[in-house]
């Protein structure tokens, strides 16, 4: 009994051996997580969202090649926010944001609405020069000057020699005497033709009459 007491005292009150701890997972690199978040934000920025009741998509923010202008729309009795958005090709949220509307029925609290219409500038095919360059502006101005109509009363350039040589055909002047002579000639010819036709018809009827007489 005396021999077993020290062993019991060691088991009950003695210091215990430390347990082996589980290996901790390797720390995740912050650069990898940041790159994933950046890719996710870019993919969300590229996606186009559509709102209910509108065919227009949310376009890119204003920058190169995009112009935003406001069109004034007069509110009428039968207008709806959805119909106005479809008419101008914008979203209902854009109209609400531009006019500070809280609900769809708030459009009747205003007489006019500002519609934000976004239009894109057409760019050249190479993508290096836009329509707004000075060269294109001069080309547009020259093209518009060519299309200007000629105002009545302006001095026209003199006609070319070829055009001046071509003169319209003047109607032949007929005197009263010539006119009467031509009229008499036509009457004479008509009378002769009628007399000839009458003689031919008489000659055709005469054999038929003699045959009836002899019969």
UniProtKB/Swiss-Prot annotation:
Keyword vocabulary terms for this entry: Acetylation, Phosphoprotein
Positions of the LysM domain: 71-115
Q: What is this protein called?
A: LysM and putative peptidoglycan-binding domain-containing protein 2
Q: Where is the composition biased (Pro residues)?
A: 17-28
Q: Where N-acetylalanine occurs, residue numbers? A: 2
Instruction: State whether keyword Mitochondrion applies.
Output: no
PROSITE patterns annotated for this entry?
LYSM
At the top level of its lineage, which domain of life is listed? Answer: Eukaryota
The record, for CDD domains, names:
LysM (cd00118)
List the residue ranges forming a coiled coil, or say none: none
List the biased-composition ranges (Basic and acidic residues): 196-205
In this chain, the stretch annotated as Disordered covers 1-40, 132-175, 193-215
Taxonomic source organism? Homo sapiens (Human)
Residues that bear Phosphoserine: 5, 24, 33, 57
């Amino acid at each position: 009994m005396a021999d077993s007491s020290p062993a019991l005292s060691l088991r009950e009150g003695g210091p215990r051996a430390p347990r082996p701890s589980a290996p901790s997972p390797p720390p995740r690199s912050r650069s990898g997580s940041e790159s994933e978040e950046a890719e996710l934000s870019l993919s969300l920025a590229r996606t186009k969202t559509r709102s209910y009741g509108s065919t227009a998509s949310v376009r890119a923010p204003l920058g190169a090649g995009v112009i935003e202008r406001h069109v004034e729309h007069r509110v009428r009795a039968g207008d709806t926010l959805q119909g106005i958005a479809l008419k101008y090709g914008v979203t209902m949220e854009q109209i609400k944001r531009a006019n500070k509307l809280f609900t769809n029925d708030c459009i009747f609290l205003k007489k006019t609405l500002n519609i934000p219409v976004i239009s894109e500038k057409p760019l050249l095919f190479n993508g290096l020069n836009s329509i707004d360059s000075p060269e294109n502006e001069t080309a547009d101005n020259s093209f518009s000057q060519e299309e200007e109509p000629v105002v009545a009363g302006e001095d026209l350039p003199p006609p070319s020699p070829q055009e001046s040589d071509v003169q319209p055909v003047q109607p032949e002047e007929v005197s009263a005497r010539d006119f009467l002579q031509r009229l008499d000639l036509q009457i004479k010819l008509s009378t002769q033709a009628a007399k000839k036709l009458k003689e031919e018809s008489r000659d055709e009827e005469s054999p038929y009459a003699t045959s009836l007489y002899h019969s």
